[in-house]
């Protein structure tokens, strides 16, 4: 949600937007044909991520979309925003970062676990994955703590999402 605009994303590069609290929706062209998995808003910019390493961004409330520089070819699961930084996590474990409103993303670290969620709160990014992986950054995604154990009972835990 940005500037009174909702944006929804889905299969086949589908992007729709609503400027009237979801009462009506208009199609927007993403320019891609693969599934878009997630969208985030920050600094007056929507960033959407998905299959085949696709990253698209919009600075006009989702009306038009441009390709961003994407350094990976795998599925980008989710993207989050905080402190003027977009952070995305990739199937296979890469964490990506952008500090220029989503124009260019760079690889930061590959923790080794598959990651499926990222959240931001209190100046901290947290990334999670389905094999008990939990990673933390307190410097806007520049560096990440190695896996933090969140498995106190010795069982196999699956984490898919995180929010603050």
Task: Give, region by region, the residue ranges found by the protein language model.
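Residue-level hotspots at or immediately adjacent to binding/recognition sites across diverse folds
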Residues: 1-164
